[in-house]
Design a protein with these regions (language model features):
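N-terminal, polar/Ser/Thr-rich
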Residues: 10-13, 34
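Active-site His/Glu-centered metal-binding helix of metallohydrolases
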Residues: 196, 200-205
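Compositionally biased, intrinsically disordered low-complexity segments enriched
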Residues: 5-6, 20, 101, 204
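A surface-exposed beta-strand-loop module
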Residues: 1-9, 66
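Hydrophobic helix-coil surface modules that form long, contiguous segments used
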Residues: 17-24, 29-197
Length: 205
């Protein structure tokens, strides 16, 4: 459903959704089964100093944030994150080189975003995370033969998450224990990279 968290570090409020397997119905009326897909027009009323992240690009009119999902999508892959999230952006640029029909290489560009609580901004190693994400985009486009389908790609580190991460289309949520606030072992970095690449692979599968 929709999870609300008050950060004990600064009393700021954060929201995010987790709908897998069948909890979208806790937030909006739907037939909550993965074989029944729909398009969506989403509108969220939120404080204007909040960041709202969803599957598609978000536009604001006053205190209402809106987005649309104009392709058929299962309800469990719809996502919303809202709050005073710290934001870092980048862009992946590459090409599709392994088309099954042998077509010429296709130039591609995907906007990337990484988000975390404001109180964790000092610990967010965004450059490393972007590097690993871009390496994943390079590898998958080199081997899968189909371009990334969801426009932009955001990764949001969220608190009190009850799994490792969730492959919401274009709006992946990840447990914020992966924002390391003290020296981490090589194993922890490997586990985080594995999670990042696992969720990115879900954008194709």
């Amino acid at each position: 459903g929709l999870h609300r968290f008050v950060d004990p570090a600064d009393d700021k409020v954060y929201l995010y959704t987790q709908f897998e397997t069948a909890d979208a119905k806790r937030v909006f009326a739907c037939f909550d089964q993965p074989d029944m897909k729909a398009t969506y027009a989403l509108h969220f009323k939120a404080p204007e100093d909040w960041t709202v992240i969803s599957n598609g690009p978000v536009s604001w009119e006053g205190d209402v944030a809106s987005t649309a999902i104009d392709y058929p999508l299962s309800t469990y892959l719809v996502a919303l994150c809202a709050g005073p999230y710290h934001e870092v952006t980048d862009t992946w640029r590459g090409e599709l080189t392994a088309h099954p029909e042998g077509k010429p290489a296709q130039k591609l560009e995907v906007p990337l975003g990484i988000y975390c609580r404001a109180s964790l901004a000092h610990a967010l190693d965004a450059e490393r995370l972007f590097t690993e994400t871009k390496q994943g985009f390079d590898f998958y486009h080199r081997n899968f033969g189909f371009p990334y389908p969801f426009g932009k790609y955001d990764q949001i580190f969220v608190p009190e998450f009850n799994a490792g991460a969730m492959e919401n289309a274009g709006c992946v949520t990840i447990r914020d224990e992966y924002v390391f606030t003290s020296q981490a072992t090589h194993y922890k970095y490997e586990r985080r990279a594995d999670t990042i690449l696992h969720e990115l692979a879900h954008m194709w599968f």
